[in-house]
């Protein structure tokens, strides 16, 4: 079961990513627990599997428009599908890596995998309830989903 301090670590990791990479802060909405099914995803989702002391998944899901603007904010003019996939994986990996500092070396993260499409299934660990952290940046909305045992 995740505790409030665990969620705070992910919130900080998320806001820190946008402050550094986009040089523009993101705001985070109130995290909420999903009690039935899996949370919805956007156009692109970067998935990180977690093992070690904690097990589960962390994923960052964002619409194409948000990722396109983020690439341009990073002075990248190539907004191809491949670059959008690379970016969403990088965001998920960086946020998880930032959190690893708080959770310690026993918080092992996989390289990111990327899923595209709204109906893409993300496998969640059985018996684990995901926490959704809404992210707002400029006029865009994304979400970080954390499901750890």
Give the positions of each predicted feature:
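N-terminal auxiliary interaction/assembly segments of multi-subunit proteins
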Residues: 1-149
